[in-house]
Amino acid sequence: MPRIKRGNVAVKRRKKILKRAKGFRGTHSKLFRVANQQVMKALRYAYVGRKRKKREFRSLWITRINAAARLNGTKYSSVIHSLKESKIAINRKMLAQMAVADPDSFVKVLSSAKAS
């Protein structure tokens, strides 16, 4: 049985890791073992960050809606409650966008939710 040398495969694997570690500081981008650890850590942070981003944006939207609602003399919880009662299906992202970009339409949505 012939001897199989895996030089090509190993080099490609290391180059792939070092390419991913580009931009890291010092030995974190030069030495394979350290770079490999840092790439794995970075991938874990990236995964967690993608989950955290959803939470942070939702809380940002809620804060913006609450601020706009308080300018109009009401609270966030009562706004959401009145929207649900009047069966107005608009999500928090759209409400927050409306509150920032077009406050007049936000007030109209609030008044229509309160009216019904």
UniProtKB/Swiss-Prot annotation:
Question: What Gene Ontology molecular function terms does this protein carry?
Answer: rRNA binding; structural constituent of ribosome
User: Main location per UniProt?
Assistant: plastid
Q: Which gene encodes it?
A: rpl20
Asked whether the UniProt record includes Protein biosynthesis among its keywords, one would answer no
What is this protein's record name? Large ribosomal subunit protein bL20c
**CDD domains attached to this UniProt entry:** Ribosomal_L20
Q: Please report which protein family the annotation says this sequence is part of.
A: Belongs to the bacterial ribosomal protein bL20 family.
What is the role of this chain?
Answer: Binds directly to 23S ribosomal RNA and is necessary for the in vitro assembly process of the 50S ribosomal subunit. It is not involved in the protein synthesizing functions of that subunit.
Task: Give the organism, scientific name.
Answer: Rhodomonas salina
